[in-house]
């Protein structure tokens, strides 16, 4: 399992490591509980790998944790969320943003499956 953590904040500081530890241990609310179009006031996003047992198969998945301005964590295990969040992390770091707004987007695939994505909004 990969221990690499990608985040908008410094994960080598005590504060950064505490955020990751708390996200891993508490998990926070699921992104699935957010309404389509919900705006999250974020102060950080991090991604890390975890092993999950899916119907008897162990597989490594990317967890995306969004840290909110009010101290909560919203988490998701989703390929589309991970892809969007990875790009958001890059932009937030490039422009050195301390806080930013993320919009939750729920969509349906052609087969009727619901999936989520994230948008960076001003």
UniProtKB/Swiss-Prot annotation:
GO MF, any single term: DNA binding
Any single Pfam family the record assigns to this protein: Phi29_Phage_SSB
InterPro entries cross-referenced by the UniProt entry: Phi29_Phage_SSB
GO biological process: DNA replication; viral DNA genome replication
UniProt entry tagged with the keyword Transcription regulation: no
Residue ranges of coiled coil: none
Keywords: DNA replication, DNA-binding, Early protein, Viral DNA replication
Keyword DNA-binding: yes
Family: Belongs to the phi29likevirus single-strand-binding protein family.
Function of the molecule: Single-stranded DNA-binding protein required for the elongation during viral DNA replication by strand displacement. Displaced viral DNA strands are transiently coated with the ssDNA-binding protein and therefore protected againt nucleases. The latter is then probably removed by the replisome that performs lagging strand synthesis or during the events that lead up to the recombination process. Has helix-destabilizing activity since it removes secondary structure from the ssDNA in replicative intermediates.
Summary of subunit composition and partner proteins: Monomer. Binds to DNA.
Full protein name: Single-stranded DNA-binding protein
Source organism of this protein record: Bacillus phage Nf
């Amino acid at each position: 399992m990969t221990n690499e953590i990608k985040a908008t904040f410094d994960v080598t500081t005590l504060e950064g490591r505490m955020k990751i530890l708390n996200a891993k241990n508490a998990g926070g609310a699921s992104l699935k509980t957010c309404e389509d179009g919900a705006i999250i006031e974020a102060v950080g996003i991090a991604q890390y790998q975890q092993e999950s047992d899916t119907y008897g198969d162990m597989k490594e998945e990317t967890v995306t944790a969004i840290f909110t301005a009010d101290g909560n964590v919203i988490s998701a295990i989703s390929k589309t969320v991970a892809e969007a969040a990875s790009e958001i992390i890059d932009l937030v770091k490039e422009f050195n943003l301390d806080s930013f707004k993320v919009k939750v987007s729920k969509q349906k695939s052609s087969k009727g499956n619901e999936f989520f994505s994230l948008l960076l909004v001003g």
